Regions:
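Flexible "cap/lid" loop of the alpha/beta hydrolase fold
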Residues: 131-134, 141-173
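Alpha/beta-hydrolase fold catalytic core
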Residues: 1-51, 73-76, 113, 294-306
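Gly/Ala-rich beta-loop-alpha elbow adjacent to hydrolase catalytic centers
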Residues: 121, 125, 129
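Catalytic histidine-centered segment of alpha/beta-hydrolase-like enzymes
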Residues: 273-282, 286
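Conserved HGGG/HGGXW glycine-rich cap/lid loop of the alpha/beta-hydrolase fold
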Residues: 41-88
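Conserved serine/cysteine hydrolase catalytic core
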Residues: 205-260, 269
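Conserved alpha/beta-hydrolase catalytic His-Asp/Glu region
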Residues: 171-228
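Active-site loop/oxyanion-hole signature of alpha/beta-hydrolase fold enzymes
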Residues: 33-39, 73, 79, 83-120, ...
Length: 306
């Protein structure tokens, strides 16, 4: 694992492309999945072929606000969910990759993404996308895994250290106080205006006394069931990977994922990007995703892939 850690660059006005993306029309919705209300946003024409975007640990649907409109501009229906325990979705007593994969498929249907959908996941979301491919493969058009760490055996000690970085449920006396404590895990330099946007959507009032807390369930790791086993046969959809040059997915990990999923899975590297590629090199990420989706839309799947 490697990460780029720098001081934040000086604040500057958000560029036109970013403000235009945030102003793009979006539908907000929710669907019940196994007793939990799962929220999502959607862009582009309902009923069109499209994509479900899956965030990483402690993140939420709004991490994609400046990415999704670019994909929708290509005529796609694009939905971004907040998985249970994240964003404005409900918390659960227990969490699992299997449950999150069910939420992804439920949102694809509720948001009217025409079947079969593409699934794109960042970090933890890439793990969810991979499991969804193993479980529902022939019902998917393909998955893109963005800078997801792929380990053999138990997670290494540095992953446990990262988990501790998500905190323990502390509250703060004001919105300003909690926003001042917003941190990325792992820390890295990102675009200040993107950071400010996602931070603003990461907090909420916690009680009538005026305390503020994070939207994600900070007991998430304690409530996680054992990880899903890897697939025992090749997945039945196409697979691509996007790696950040200074991110968490090494070339060795990319090879490990290819082996697990049983697909050739090209890997595109985003130069100069850290793990949080949505926040530091978003336009390069958009270009990579557009290229993959355009290629898949225009060509037939390989033999052995539905």
């Amino acid at each position: 694992m490697s990460a780029v850690i720098h001081e934040e660059p000086p604040a500057r006005p958000a560029p036109q492309w970013f403000t235009a993306a945030l102003a793009a029309p979006a539908d907000d919705g929710a669907v019940d999945v196994a007793g939990a209300r799962i929220t999502y946003r959607a862009w582009g024409p309902a009923g069109a072929p499209g994509v479900v975007l899956v965030h990483g640990t402690a993140a939420h649907a709004r991490w994609w606000d400046h990415i999704a409109p670019f994909l929708a501009a290509d005529g796609l229906r694009v939905a971004a969910l907040s998985m249970s325990g994240h964003g404005d979705s409900d918390w659960r007593d227990r969490y699992s990759i299997r449950q999150w994969s069910e939420e992804v498929m439920a949102v694809a249907s509720a948001a009217r993404v025409a079947a079969p959908p593409f699934i794109i996941g960042h970090s933890l979301g890439g793990g969810v996308a991979s499991y969804t491919a193993a479980r529902y493969g022939s019902a998917l058009a393909g998955i893109v895994v963005i800078d997801t760490a792929v380990h053999e055996g138990p997670p290494p000690p540095e992953m446990t250290t990262m988990e501790m970085g998500f905190g323990t449920g502390r509250t703060y006396p004001s919105r300003e106080a909690i926003l001042a404590r917003f941190r990325l895990v792992p820390e890295q330099q990102v675009l200040p205006y993107v950071r400010e946007h996602i931070a603003a959507w990461s907090v909420r009032p916690r009680d009538e006394a005026g305390q503020w807390g994070w939207k994600f369930d900070q007991s998430l790791f304690a409530k996680m069931d054992s990880q899903a086993p890897p697939p025992t046969e090749p997945v039945r959809c196409r697979v691509a990977m996007v790696r950040a040059q200074h991110g968490m997915m090494t070339a060795e990990m990319a090879g490990r994922l290819r082996s697990r999923l049983g697909q050739p899975a090209p890997a595109i590297e985003i130069p100069a990007a850290g793990h949080h590629v949505l926040l530091d090199e978003p336009l390069s990420l958009v270009t990579a995703l557009r290229a993959v989706l355009a290629n898949w839309t225009a060509t037939q799947p390989r033999d052995g892939v539905v």
